[in-house]
Amino acid sequence: MNLTAKLANRPDDHGLREGYLLLADISGYTAFLTGTELEHAHEIIGELTTLIRERLEPPMRFVKLEGDAVFCYAETGTFREGERLVELIEACYCDFANRVVDMTRATTCRCGACAAISSLGLKFITHHGSYVV
C-alpha cells in the first residue's frame, strides 16, 4: 500500500491535507546569540518570536517554535486568494521591523545584545501543497 493510500485510511484529524506551510525565521540569529550576552539576547528573541506568532495566528495554526523559527500551517480554504497570505506575511514583516526599531530606540542598555538588535531581520518560506498533520 502506498503512502497516499495509508494516509487516506487514517482518521480525518491526522490525514493528508492541502494547504499552506509557513516558516518565519529570524535572520542573524546565530551571530546574535554567539556574539552577545545570552540573558538579554534570549529576552529579545523571545519577544520577537512571540510577536511573529501572535501576528500569524490566526489565521495560521501554530505548530512549533524552533529557536528563532516559527512554523505554522493553514488549510487551503483559509485564504480564498493567495494574495491574502502575501498580505499577512507583509504585515508580519512590517510589525517585526517596527518592533526592532522601537526596541533599538527604547533601550538604554549598552550590552552587546541590546546594541545588536538592529542586526536582526526576518525571512519567510512558504509552500502550498499536501501535508500531514
Give residue ranges: language-model regions:
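Acidic, glycine-rich loop-and-strand cores that form catalytic or ligand-binding grooves
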Residues: 91-97
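Catalytic NTP-binding/metal-coordinating core of nucleotidyl cyclase/transferase enzymes
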Residues: 3-88
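Catalytic core of nucleotidyl cyclases, primarily class III adenylyl/guanylyl cyclases
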Residues: 57-84, 99-133
